[in-house]
Regions:
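Conserved alpha-helix/loop element of class I SAM-dependent methyltransferases that forms part
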Residues: 71-90
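Conserved SAM-binding loop of SAM-dependent methyltransferases across substrates and taxa
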Residues: 98-109
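Conserved SAM-binding motif I beta-strand of class I
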Residues: 111-116
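Conserved SAM/SAH-binding beta-strand->alpha-helix loop
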Residues: 118-120
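Conserved SAM-binding loop
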Residues: 125-126
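A short acidic, Gly/Pro-enriched loop at the edge of an enzyme's catalytic core
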Residues: 150-159
Length: 200
């Protein structure tokens, strides 16, 4: 018995699909632009005396001038103190940059994963790790903030996003990163979002 009949049909909104595709392309382009900027900035890092305190690229948002070293030291110490006050053991730092926080927090932890989309930054931190026994347990990944591939769910007690989210292309990307981060965070763990620029 052939009892076929049409019960429903869908007409895709081609304009909405085009907008979504354009939005995804825009996201990719923006992330790519930031990556290029940081690759170029970080590649100027060879002449640094204290490789664990490389503040290249930390510039005043208004003047474009480099931030004074003493201000940066105070900011780093305060940030590290805040994070260490939670007594972290298994840490994921998304956007570890040149290791300002990593080099100070990782020695106090059992596990420390650092990710950054800049290969130059990851290579720089990898070289730093090779010179310090207290950092030998650090695992580095060259990847974008939304890539959590190979990381166990509910493994980390602390996830750090410091001076990172203002470079995300939009709120959807931020929400995607946060959703994935929460999956990797142990119940009762800490998500540290720091140094968020105020655009108001």
């Amino acid at each position: 018995m052939n009892n076929k009949r049409l019960v429903a049909y869908v007409i895709p909104d081609s304009q909405e699909m085009e907008v979504q595709i354009e939005s995804e392309e825009w996201q990719e382009n923006l992330v790519s632009d930031w990556k290029t900027l940081y690759e170029n900035t970080y590649s100027q890092s060879e002449e640094i005396e204290d490789r664990a305190f490389n503040i290249i690229g930390w510039n005043n948002s208004y003047t474009g001038e480099p931030l004074p070293a003493e201000e940066m030291r105070e900011w780093v110490e305060n940030t590290v103190d805040q994070i260490l006050s939670t007594q972290p053991e298994n840490v994921l730092e998304i956007g570890c940059g040149l290791g300002l926080l990593l080099s100070r927090i990782a020695p106090e932890c059992k596990e420390y994963y650092g990710t950054d989309f800049s290969k130059t930054a990851v290579d720089y931190v990898d070289n730093l790790i090779k010179t310090r026994d207290t950092l030998r347990h650090v695992k580095l990944f060259n990847r974008k903030a939304d890539n959590f591939e190979g990381m166990e769910n509910e493994f980390f007690d602390t996830i750090i996003l410091n001076s990172v989210i203002q470079y995300f292309p939009d709120v959807d990307y931020l929400l995607l990163v946060l959703k994935n981060a929460f999956n990797k965070l142990k119940p009762g763990g800490y998500l540290f979002i720091g140094d968020v620029r105020n655009f108001a």
